[in-house]
Amino acid sequence: MRRAVCPGSFDPIHNGHLEVIARAAGLFDEVIVAVSTNYAKKYRFSLEDRMEMARETLASLRGIIVEPMGEGLLAEYCRHRGVSAIVKGLRSSSDFDYELPMATMNRQLTGVETVFLPAEAHYVHLSSTLIKEVNVLGGDISEYVPKSVLKRLLAGEPPTEPSRKG
């Protein structure tokens, strides 16, 4: 079985993410959407909410598993889950410059390869941060996020602090 992981914080998941994950699902038998938490970041949505939004929006795709990544190195997570490839979307050359050293390190640590998928032109400008900023300022983001995500963003819930379980 060819298994890949699409890691990210997905705060929130948007149509650019969905497009890359759908393309990955066409390349691999199983794609794990690994929702990460960086304890140095302030999140708009809790880990549970981010996972729920991902599950809701990806439910129609076969072979998709949504789970928390947990703490630690992505390469070790891949080894533990039997993943042969990490799939990353690239919006620009600066994304490539950022991702290439990590891809090289992941391959050296555990042999896991990184597959880069260029973003569709319609989504190259998207980021979760930009979507949250435009939303807070009253802009229309409905073209860029799934309806279930839009509903949550418009509900105006306060940002959440990541919780350490332990």
Curated annotation (Swiss-Prot):
Substrate binds at residues 9, 41, 74, 88. One of its GO terms (molecular function) is pantetheine-phosphate adenylyltransferase activity. Signal peptide: none annotated. ATP binds at residues 9-10, 17, 89-91, 99, 123-129. It catalyses: (R)-4'-phosphopantetheine + ATP + H(+) = 3'-dephospho-CoA + diphosphate. GO terms for cellular component: cytoplasm. PANTHER family: PHOSPHOPANTETHEINE ADENYLYLTRANSFERASE. Reversibly transfers an adenylyl group from ATP to 4'-phosphopantetheine, yielding dephospho-CoA (dPCoA) and pyrophosphate. NCBIfam families: coaD_prev_kdtB, cyt_tran_rel. This is Phosphopantetheine adenylyltransferase.
